[in-house]
Amino acid sequence: PVLSRGLGDVYKRQDKEYPNTPSGMPGVQTIFPVMIDHVNNGKLELNQLINLMCENPCKIFGIKNKGFIKEGFDADLTIVDMDKEVTIKNEMIASKCGWTPFHNYKVKGFPIGTIVNGILVMSEGKILVESKGQPLKF
């Protein structure tokens, strides 16, 4: 009904390949700050968060060389300022959809750096180099 009434645009897959499509509800950019906030509020222990977001997904999905700080594993790390207070805003969202269900949600604890394969790629919210990410190996 939405398309037949002219309320939306249709894109063929070849016109808009992922990741250049406006995806549905975002969460990748906000889940870690929200979860760190739960650590700071005493709802979750830091080691539980590491298990939930780093180690266990790699174990469950069989993702190779990720999820742990170990020799031979990819040096992918997130640097967090546990005391940094941020109010999440739609304008901060890098996803093409441009919004978040956490708009105006205040968090304590925020990522200030990202290291991918040993290279600092984000610092204080600024992308420093073009993505060097590689497809996951299972």
Annotated model-derived regions:
Residues 9-82:
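His/Asp/Glu-enriched, well-ordered alpha-helical/loop segment
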Residues 17-20, 74-136:
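C-terminal cap of metal-dependent C-N hydrolases
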